[in-house]
Amino acid sequence: MAEHGAHITTASVADDQPSIFEVVAQDSLMTAVRPALQHVVKVLAESNPAHYGFFWRWFDEIFTLLDFLLQQHYLSRTSASFSEHFYGLKRIVAGSSPQLQRPASAGLPKEHLWKSAMFLVLLPYLKVKLEKLASTLREEDEYSIHPPSSHWKRFYRVFLAAYPFVTMTWEGWFLTQQLRYILGKAEHHSPLLKLAGVRLGRLTAQDIQAMEHRLVEASAMQEPVRSIGKKIKSALKKAVGGVALSLSTGLSVGVFFLQFLDWWYSSENQETIKSLTALPTPPPPVHLDYNSDSPLLPKMKTVCPLCRKARVNDTVLATSGYVFCYRCVFNYVRSHQACPITGYPTEVQHLIKLYSPEN
C-alpha cells in the first residue's frame, strides 16, 4: 500500500501525456475514413442509382448518425473516441488528481461525454455543410444564378467574403494550440479538448485489464428482464452496441486497408508497381451473341434491330450504346433485363431517349 501511495504522489500529470505524433495520427484517422467511405458510396450510387442513390444523397446525415453511435459507444466504455482508443489513448477529466481519476473502463462522466460527442460528431458535420454551402454559392455567384433583386444576395456576398477568413482563423487557432503543445506550454493539442474539459493520456495496463474484465463480466451476466420497458431498453442497448462493434471492426479493417494503399502508392514502392504493371495490354474482347436468337445488326443505321423497321422515338441503351425504337427496346428490356445485342444486364432506367434535329 505504501509503495502504491508513493507511486501516485510522485507521478506527474505529464507522465502519461502522448506525443504530438500520436495525437496528430489519431486526429487524421477519422479524417481519412470519411472521404474513403464517401468514395465507396459514390461508386455504388453511380453503378446502381435505384438502390444506392439514397445513401449518396444523405451520406452526411447517415455518416454522422453512425459516427455518433460509434463515438458514444467508445466514450461510455473506454473513455476515448474510436481513433483515440485505436492508438491506445484515453480522455481524462481536466484538473482531476491521479487519486480521483476514473478508470477508462468506467467511461466519461455524462457532462464530459456529451460535450466530447458534440465536438467529435456535430462540429465536423456542420463544418462539412458550411464547406458545401460555400462551394455552391461560389458557383452560383460565378454564373450569376441569383437574380439581382434577391434579398439573400447581400448575405451570400458577405458569407463568401467572410468564410475564408473564418476558416483561416479556425485553422490558425488549432495550429497555435499544437505548437504550444509541442513546446510543453499546453496540455491540450486541440482547443476542442479544452472546451470539453478533458485531456488525452495513455492507457495503462490496469485500464486494459479492467476493460477486458468488463467484457467478460458483461458476457457472463445475463439477468432475466421482466418488464416490457426494460426488455425494449435492453434490446436497443444491445442493438446499438452491436452496430458500434460492427463499425469498430469494419473501421479497423478499413484502416489497415488504407495504410496498405498508402504503402502501395508510396514513392518507395513505385518501382515494384511498375514491374507488376509493365505487362502487355490484352486485346479487346470479341463480342459474341449471348444466345442463338439474338438479332443481328441491320446494315442500315436508321433501322431498329428489333422490329427491322425505320426507328421511331430513337432510344439508346446506356449499357451498350445501341439505338432502338423506344417501344421495342422498352418491352424487350422489361421482359429480359438485358441488351438485345450484347446481352449486357440492363434495366429500364438505362433507356435514354434521343431528340435529333430531324425529329
Swiss-Prot record:
Topology versus the membrane: Multi-pass membrane protein
UniProt binding sites for Zn(2+): 304, 307, 325, 328
InterPro entries reported in the protein's UniProt record: PEX12, Pex_N, Znf_RING/FYVE/PHD
Membrane side Cytoplasmic: residue ranges: 48-51, 140-144, 278-359
Single Gene Ontology BP annotation: protein import into peroxisome matrix
The protein's annotated pathway: Protein modification; protein ubiquitination
Membrane topology (Peroxisomal matrix): 1-19, 77-109, 184-249
TM region positions: 20-47, 52-76, 110-139, 145-183, 250-277
Gene Ontology cellular-component terms listed: peroxisomal importomer complex; peroxisomal membrane; peroxisome
CDD domains: mRING_PEX12
GO MF terms, alphabetically ordered: ubiquitin ligase activator activity; ubiquitin-protein transferase activity; zinc ion binding
Zinc fingers, RING-type class: 304-343
Chief location bin: membrane
Localization in the cell: Peroxisome membrane
SUPFAM superfamilies, alphabetized: RING/U-box
Domain note: The three subunits of the retrotranslocation channel (PEX2, PEX10 and PEX12) coassemble in the membrane into a channel with an open 10 Angstrom pore. The RING-type zinc-fingers that catalyze PEX5 receptor ubiquitination are positioned above the pore on the cytosolic side of the complex. The RING-type zinc-finger is degenerated and only coordinates one zinc ions, preventing E3 ubiquitin-protein ligase activity.
Record function comment: Component of a retrotranslocation channel required for peroxisome organization by mediating export of the PEX5 receptor from peroxisomes to the cytosol, thereby promoting PEX5 recycling. The retrotranslocation channel is composed of PEX2, PEX10 and PEX12; each subunit contributing transmembrane segments that coassemble into an open channel that specifically allows the passage of PEX5 through the peroxisomal membrane. PEX12 also regulates PEX5 recycling by activating the E3 ubiquitin-protein ligase activity of PEX10.
Family affiliation: Belongs to the pex2/pex10/pex12 family.
Subunit composition and interactions: Component of the PEX2-PEX10-PEX12 retrotranslocation channel, composed of PEX2, PEX10 and PEX12. Interacts with PEX19 via its cytoplasmic domain.
Protein's UniProt name: Peroxisome assembly protein 12
Source organism of this protein record: Rattus norvegicus (Rat)
Lineage start: Eukaryota, Metazoa, Chordata, Craniata, Vertebrata
